[in-house]
Every structure is written in C-alpha cells, then in structure tokens.
Regions:
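Ser/Thr-glycine-rich phosphate-binding loops at phosphate-binding pockets of nucleotides
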Residues: 167-173
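Nucleotide/phosphate-binding catalytic cleft detector across ATP-hydrolyzing
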Residues: 1-164, 181-196, 208, 216-314
Length: 314
C-alpha cells in the first residue's frame, strides 16, 4: 500500500490486489480465496467479515474457477478483506482507496471495463472485519494484464527474447517480452494451473492406491516437494506432479518455447511446481518465488500513472 496525493490534492491509498483463484494477494498479505456466506452470525469468527448485514467467513471453502470474476459477489467481498488487511497493517480503518488489479492476459481487452465497474460498484463502503469497523471511499480502479505486472520491476533484465509464464491456481498466462518490450500479439491464457495439477494427482491416487488424500497434503507436496505421509503415497503424488510439470513444458513448446533461443521467467504460485518437479536448465530459467510480485507490480504501475498525472508519493 502506498500513500499518495493525487492531482486533486486528495490523499489516496494505492492498494495492489491480485485476485487469484487459490489466493488473494496484496503487496504484503496472502490469504485463501474462499468465501462462505451466512445469514446468521456463525459460531467460529476467526476471519469474519460483515457487510450489508451478511456474514462472510474469509478463507473458507474453495473458490471454483470462473471465466468471469464478476459473476458473483465473492471477489468483491474478498477485495474488502484485502483492503482491510492492508489498512490494518498501517493501523488505519478509514481511507480513500485507489485499487490496482488485473486480469489474465487474453481477458483484459474484453473484461477490463466490467471488472472495473464491479470493483467500483459502491463509492463508499462500511463493513466490519475481525471485529474492527472500516470506512472506505473509492477513488478509482486500474486493471492491468496479469503476469506482466510481476515483471514490471525487472523489465531491464529482459534482454533479447524472453518468455514469461505466470502459473496461477486456475490459469497459466504466457507472454513474450523481447528487449524489455511485451508483445501484445504473443499473449496466451491456458486453463492449466496448480488446481488442475491437484486434480490430476487426486485421480492418480484413486487409480493406483484406491485412496482419497486431502488436498492440503497434495498442495503441500506440490509446494515443498514433500509431506509427512507414507512413502507409497508420496511416490504417487511426486510422479503425478512430475508428469503434470512435463505437460506444462509441452504447452510452452506449443507456444514456440525453445530453451536454447530464449530465457524463461516463471512467476506465480505455480513456480514451485517447476522448481520441485521440472527438468530444466537452471541457467536459462528464472523462477520468481515472491507470490506477491504481481500485486506489487499492479501497485507500482498505478503509482507511476498517478505521478504522471501530477500526483506524488507522501
């Protein structure tokens, strides 16, 4: 979160938010993209958000993949939670907020306007999160291409031909950046993220061992390469993850990836799959492990935009 004066001399808080299918990320926070709605006050209130008289448990249940993030209220409620977490980190509960967010590369052109309207559906919002009251006024919202934002800070490193791949929970975004310039005509979005890997692993476990393993265990193995479970289960999970990672590289080759002719930059939560289970030349592949990199990029781009329009950091 960055505090700025805009060209109207108003104090605004620029907050970058990465609306992932697995996790919501800001520049400093990460939490599961789950929302459970209750009409009555629930018993457990660890992550309770109250908005418009409705109770929401944040981080509960799994957010299913949806081609349009505006199709229900979940991402709006998650946005309020993300804003609250950033404000709370600075000891604040009232602010005028300018959101910096994004969409998958090939969705930006068709969905940008609708997502912007969705995020700005209310000029002023009052809600409660973690038993703390918040008052938020919205100053604006900018929508950027997902993936590219994570590379914003290091564009100077992209000399020659480069492929950038952002592996999220629900999608994999591919972009070419040549001599620090993104190529708009060479941007692709595949429905091939870490959640699909979890599904593939789950199927392998059921087929080979006749066992259902909790997704939390599978996700831990994908993220770290291991877990405190029996070796036979670990072996099946690792093999399925390796097979899935091979398929990722196959899809990259379908988009003309050649490790001898270009460098590969991997961002997003799925980078751990490449690191733990991929076969690649480490001198030609860079894995950015900062899961908040995209949110930081969104934030930086909006800061630059406001500065160009006469605003300043304070």
């Amino acid at each position: 979160m960055r505090m700025m004066k805009n060209n109207n001399n108003e104090t605004v808080m620029v907050i970058g938010i990465d609306h992932g299918y697995g996790n919501m990320k800001t520049a400093t926070r990460c939490f599961p993209s789950g929302v459970a709605r209750y009409d009555k006050e629930p018993i457990f209130q660890n992550n309770l958000l109250v908005y418009n008289g409705v109770y929401y448990q944040i981080g509960e249940e799994h957010k299913e993949f949806c081609a349009e993030k505006t199709q229900d209220e979940d991402y709006y409620v998650l946005t309020l939670a993300a804003i609250a977490k950033e404000l709370d980190g600075k000891g604040m509960n009232r602010a005028k907020v300018h959101i910096a967010a994004g969409l998958p590369l090939t969705w930006v052109a068709t969905q940008k306007e609708d997502f912007q309207k969705y995020l700005l559906q209310n000029e002023i919002v009052d809600f409660t999160f973690h038993n703390k009251e918040y008052h938020v006024e919205f100053a604006g919202a900018d929508i950027y291409p997902q993936g590219f934002a994570a590379a914003f800070y290091r564009l100077q490193d992209f000399k020659g031909i480069n492929m950038l791949v952002d592996i999220g929970n629900g999608t994999m975004n591919i972009m070419y950046i040549n001599n620090s310039r993104p190529l708009e005509k060479k941007c692709f979005t595949e429905k091939y993220g870490t959640h699909q890997c979890v599904l593939a692993v789950r199927e392998s476990l059921l087929k080979e061992l006749g066992t259902v393993v909790d997704d939390l265990v599978i996700e831990q193995v994908i993220r770290t390469g291991t877990a405190d479970i029996g070796e036979k289960y670990l072996a099946v999970i690792r093999k399925a993850a390796r097979d899935y990672t091979k398929e990722i590289f196959h899809k990259l080759r379908e988009r003309e990836y050649n490790p001898e002719l270009m460098r590969l930059y991997v961002v997003g939560g799925g980078g751990c799959m490449i690191q733990n289970f991929g076969e690649y030349d480490k001198s030609r592949v860079t894995i950015v492990r900062d899961i908040c990199a995209t949110a930081k990029g969104y934030e930086a781009m909006t800061v630059r935009k406001i500065q160009r329009n006469g605003g300043m950091l304070i």
